[in-house]
Amino acid sequence: MGAAGLKVPEMALRLCVVPLSLASLWEMASNAQADDTYGEVKFSDLSGFSYLVGVNAVTAAYAVASVLASSFKRPLAARYDWVVLVMDQASAYLLVTSASAAAELLQLARHGDRGVSWGEACSYFGRFCGKATVSLALHAAALACFAALSLVSAFRVFSSRCHPPPDADGQPPKHARDEEQRVYHY
């Protein structure tokens, strides 16, 4: 299967990222719980959760932009393959770092850390922890999509480097024709 054969799965992955990122964003951004005894907790009280919301917004916006950009005809889109590869990689890395930050906060909320006198909080704010867990799971699914997209983008870039696209007249580029005609003698 060539790079052109990956067009439909690539578009499907890009389209999947949008609702996954937006659902994760919504689940976390609407996450707050109040308790008469222990007060209130909101996602914005914890920087790791705020970071997750921000990264979800950025990756959803990029996914929409990349769907629009990849809907152009291939010769125009081919010029931007390197940009798409770098942006897919950057999105995947942002998703990894924000997932890591949110997972650490959830771990502390569930189990605490006696060494630094951080008590567990999920027994008091169970709904908050549940929504944060759902948001993190949706975020991980978006991460899986971007990991696959990074592989597809890399395949496209590096397979096109080995086989240059034809000129406007449908012929291989002049340097490729010259290389094919050269005879090597040992």
Swiss-Prot record:
Keyword Transmembrane helix in record: yes
Name of one Pfam family that matches: CASP_dom
Subcellular location: Cell membrane
Region (Disordered): 165-186
Keyword Transferase on entry: no
A GO cellular component entry from the record: plasma membrane
Cytoplasmic topological domain residue ranges: 1-5, 70-81, 153-186
NCBIfam families xrefs: A_tha_TIGR01569 (TIGR01569)
Assembly description: Homodimer and heterodimers.
Name of the protein this chain belongs to: CASP-like protein 2D1
Originating species: Zea mays (Maize)
Classification lineage: Eukaryota, Viridiplantae, Streptophyta, Embryophyta, Tracheophyta
